[in-house]
């Protein structure tokens, strides 16, 4: 099974000539996974280069750091975000980060790790709009010359972070790591990792 997130499908096929039309009445169906689910796939990641942190130019303004989406040619793919790292590198700056699903990034370039990857990412976007999107999780970090705190993704329900597609419009839904700071010009580094289970 390559796309376990799609609906069940039942078909009736005649293998021989029949005297009348065949009918099939399907009442219900169930899929059960005993023993839970362990994500096993190809690991991939996107990160801001160590020498090019994102500059949060205006205080309290939210900037996109990394955006992910399924490739338009791989909308049947299953990719699940499984790691997050946000590191504020400006001394005495406080940072707020969020994982947003369904927002839209503007500017920058969408690239991919490899031709076989299900996912493309954008680390150069200039702005983003929440629109009809929603914040899945959020947190805070602080930059200090005594040692900065880092952010981590809660791993209790990773399926909440599965990359989605709009099946009615055949378009991918963006998953965006955004951040803001209380200090104008604060710099931040970030990375996102994910598993691709049906490459």
Region locations from a protein language model:
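Noncatalytic modules at the cell exterior or secretory-pathway interfaces
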Residues: 3-16, 84, 162-183
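Terminal beta-strand-rich extracellular "head" domains
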Residues: 102-154
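C-terminal interaction-tip segments
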Residues: 31, 170-172, 180-199
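Ligand-recognition surfaces built from glycine- and aromatic
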Residues: 1-77, 95-97
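Generic structural motif
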Residues: 15-17, 92, 102-104, 182, ...
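A short beta-strand element within beta-rich, extracytoplasmic domains
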Residues: 77-91, 173-180, 188-191
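Non-catalytic interaction/regulatory modules that flank or connect domains
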Residues: 67-116
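Beta-sandwich interaction modules
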Residues: 140-174
């Amino acid at each position: 099974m390559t796309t376990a997130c799609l609906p069940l499908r039942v078909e009736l096929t005649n293998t021989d000539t029949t005297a009348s039309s065949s009918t099939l009445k399907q009442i219900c169906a169930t899929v059960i996974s005993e023993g839970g689910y362990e994500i096993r796939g190809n690991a991939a990641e996107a990160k801001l280069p160590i020498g090019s942190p994102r500059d949060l130019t205006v205080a309290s303004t939210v900037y996109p750091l990394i955006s992910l989406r399924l490739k338009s040619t791989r909308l049947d793919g299953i990719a699940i975000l499984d790691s997050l790292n946000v590191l504020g590198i400006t001394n005495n700056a406080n940072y707020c980060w969020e994982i947003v699903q369904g927002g839209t990034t503007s500017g920058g370039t969408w690239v991919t790790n490899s031709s076989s990857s299900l996912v493309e990412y954008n680390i150069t976007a200039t702005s983003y709009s929440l629109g009809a999107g929603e914040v899945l999780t959020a947190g805070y970090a602080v930059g200090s010359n005594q040692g900065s705190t880092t952010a981590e993704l809660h791993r209790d329900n990773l399926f909440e972070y599965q990359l989605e597609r709009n099946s009615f419009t055949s378009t991918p839904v963006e998953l965006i790591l955004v951040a803001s700071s209380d200090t104008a010009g604060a710099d931040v580094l970030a990375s996102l990792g994910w598993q691709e289970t049906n490459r």
